[in-house]
Curated annotation (Swiss-Prot):
Family classification: Belongs to the polypeptide deformylase family.
Active site: E139
Biological process terms in GO annotation: co-translational protein modification; translation
InterPro entries registered for this protein in UniProt: Peptide_deformylase, Peptide_deformylase_sf
Protein name: Peptide deformylase-like
HAMAP family (alphabetical): Pep_deformylase
GO MF entries: peptide deformylase activity
Species: Bradyrhizobium diazoefficiens (strain JCM 10833 / BCRC 13528 / IAM 13628 / NBRC 14792 / USDA 110)
Length: 170
């Protein structure tokens, strides 16, 4: 695309306190929001990752971008909330663009329903399962100030943090 410009923003790295602060709801559906969503997509692809939130780049707003595969493309979720979760649980390996190089199995609901607004400010609902359901839960946790490793046992969490610190030191 001629004239297209990628904007890759710096990622907030664990254990930055900003990752533990609940994000504020978006109230303005404008060009600034669309620019934020585009920057999130560029930053996520460069990381690389399949999901990112505005807090991952230091913006305390409830915005999520997911891109699980090329067929479905990228999707932006503004002010997403889980409105229903299945009783069935699954284990899935998770990680974060804010803590690259480490991952572990996390238990999540197998299916969820979310409500959210699109970039035009239209309310939407979406039912998801498998990887998309895991991503919805993971990213909404992040918007609520819960980093994914908080879902692990203390022993697993401490082991992952030590591994990440060692990797970060080089």
């Amino acid at each position: 695309m001629v004239g297209a410009c990628m904007t890759i923003r710096p990622l907030v790295r664990y254990p930055d306190r900003r990752l533990a602060i609940p994000a504020r709801p978006v109230t303005a559906f404008d060009d600034e929001l669309r620019e934020l969503a585009a920057d999130l997509l560029d930053t996520m692809r460069a990381a690389p990752g399949i999901g990112i939130t505005a807090p991952h780049i230091g913006v305390p707003l409830r915005v999520v971008v997911l891109e699980l595969d090329a067929k479905d493309g990228a999707r932006t979720y503004v002010n997403p909330e889980i409105t229903w979760a299945s009783p069935e649980m699954i284990m899935h390996r998770e990680g974060s663009v804010s803590m690259p190089g480490v991952n572990d199995e996390v238990q999540r609901h197998a299916r969820v329903r979310i409500s959210y607004w699109d970039l035009d400010g239209t309310m939407q609902t979406e039912d998801s399962e498998a990887l998309r359901a895991v991503c919805h839960q993971h990213e909404i946790d992040q918007l609520d100030g819960m980093f994914w490793i908080q879902r692990l046992s203390r022993l697993k969490r401490e082991r992952l943090v030590k591994k990440f610190e060692k990797m970060s030191r080089g």
